[in-house]
Amino acid sequence: MAFLKKCLFLVLFLGLVSLSICEEEKREEENEEVQEDDDQSEEKRGFLDVIKHVGKAAGKAALNAVTEMVNQGEQ
């Protein structure tokens, strides 16, 4: 009977150890996924900032061109 208890405790202990190792690996994988998502978000934000600045510059150039045309038409 004592032998069976020892075997049962050993099996339970090894099961708990492997479960904790699996959970740790799962957390590490989730952290890596979160970091990858953060990197992709930063890239998207950078791209959108560039588009925003280009749009502003194009708008200002168009406004200046229209203003010059109006000024020339008034003269």
From Swiss-Prot:
Coiled-coil stretches noted in the UniProt entry, renumbered to this chain: none
Stretch forming the signal peptide: 1-22
Q: Which residues carry this modification: Glutamine amide?
A: Q72
Entry's family note:
Belongs to the frog skin active peptide (FSAP) family. Cruzioseptin subfamily.
Cellular compartments annotated: Secreted
Q: Which keywords does UniProt give here?
A: Amidation, Amphibian defense peptide, Antimicrobial, Cleavage on pair of basic residues, Secreted, Signal
Spell out the Acidic residues composition-biased ranges. 30-41
What is the documented function of this protein? Has antimicrobial activity.
Q: Name one GO biological process term.
A: defense response
Which domain of life does this protein belong to? Eukaryota
Region (Disordered) residue spans: 25-44
Q: Which residues are the propeptide, according to the record?
A: 23-43, 74-75
Disulfide bonds, paired cysteine numbers: none
Q: Which Pfam families did the record assign?
A: DD_K, FSAP_sig_propep
According to UniProt, the name of this protein is Cruzioseptin-8
GO CC terms, sorted: extracellular region
Task: State which tissues express it.
Answer: Expressed by the skin glands.
